[in-house]
Regions:
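Short E/K-rich amphipathic alpha-helical oligomerization segments
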Residues: 20, 24-56
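Acidic, serine/threonine/proline-rich low-complexity intrinsically disordered regions
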Residues: 51-63, 67
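A short, terminal or domain-edge coil/loop segment
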Residues: 3, 41-42, 79-81
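Generic cytosolic/nucleocytoplasmic N-terminal low-complexity/intrinsically disordered segments
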Residues: 1, 8, 17, 42-45, ...
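Short, charge/polar-rich alpha-helical segments
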Residues: 1-27, 57
Length: 81
């Protein structure tokens, strides 16, 4: 097995681990955002929109990174098929 192949397998493993961690963080942010923007709150002035906005911005960053990682993982997996 050549060195490049071993390095690519390492990149694949790292990418999968990073994807898993970011996916968990994204899921947690979705739960947090839903709690901050409670649809059952009758007084909309009590909604914590600033906190939700910051969380949404982070979620947007995570989703972009997750999409890029997913593409990278697919390409690496295709290489090893």
């Amino acid at each position: 097995m050549n060195i490049e192949r071993i390095q690519l397998k390492g990149q694949l493993a790292e990418s999968k681990a990073k994807f898993k961690n970011l996916d968990v963080e994204a899921s947690a942010l979705v739960i947090l955002i839903r709690s901050l923007l409670n649809p059952f709150e009758e007084d909309t002035t009590k909604l914590e929109t600033q906190k939700a906005l910051v969380s949404m911005q982070r979620l947007d960053e995570l989703l972009l990174e997750l999409r890029n990682l997913k593409s990278k993982i697919q390409k690496l997996e295709e290489y090893f098929e």
